Amino acid sequence: MERAIFAGGCFWCMVQPFEEQAGILSVRSGYTGGHVHNPSYEQVCSKTTGHTEAVEIIFDPSLISYSDLVELYWAQTDPTDAFGQFEDRGDNYRPVIYYTDERQREIAERSKQTLQASGRFDQPIVTSIEPAEPFYLAEDYHQGFYQKNPERYAQSSAIRHQFLEEHWQ
């Protein structure tokens, strides 16, 4: 099994696209990249901990590759916005691919270069690619949010879905 960590704005909106893929064993919402041990949602939202909301994905590389996950990640984000994603603003919502080893870093960097060269976006691709740091699970009420709260999830993801349809379909 392998692990991937992606930050792409509100973690609620990052779970479902990955959970629907064959070879995914788990997708958990949490926080990473900051300087506070095991922060709470309230602490992360205060923008004082340095953490980003992210998802940790455990996957079977014999069924789905890390490269496939990176491609799926791009299609869930606005890679030209370094200051948050969609209606969620601030460092805690910035887009980041966290790599767990050198191979993942190389795949992510190559994929970013390919996306930049594709001309899909007029602006530069600014998503960060950074080494993985400790990942802290978010509170239980954040886990599987789209399943537990479908109406609120639909409202919170509407702007994202509109952007994705315009730029990734």
UniProtKB/Swiss-Prot annotation:
Domain of life: Bacteria
Keyword Manganese: no
Keyword Cell membrane applies: no
InterPro entries: Met_Sox_Rdtase_MsrA_dom, Met_Sox_Rdtase_MsrA_sf
Classification via SUPFAM superfamilies: Peptide methionine sulfoxide reductase
Pfam families: PMSR
EC number: 1.8.4.11
Catalytic center residues: C10
GO biological process, one term: protein modification process
GO molecular function, one term: peptide-methionine (S)-S-oxide reductase activity
Keyword annotations of the record: Oxidoreductase
Catalysed reactions listed for this entry: L-methionyl-[protein] + [thioredoxin]-disulfide + H2O = L-methionyl-(S)-S-oxide-[protein] + [thioredoxin]-dithiol; [thioredoxin]-disulfide + L-methionine + H2O = L-methionine (S)-S-oxide + [thioredoxin]-dithiol
Reported function: Has an important function as a repair enzyme for proteins that have been inactivated by oxidation. Catalyzes the reversible oxidation-reduction of methionine sulfoxide in proteins to methionine.
Similarity remark: Belongs to the MsrA Met sulfoxide reductase family.
Alphabetized NCBIfam families for the sequence: msrA
Matching HAMAP family: MsrA
Protein name: Peptide methionine sulfoxide reductase MsrA
Native organism taxonomy: Bacteria, Bacillati, Bacillota, Bacilli, Lactobacillales
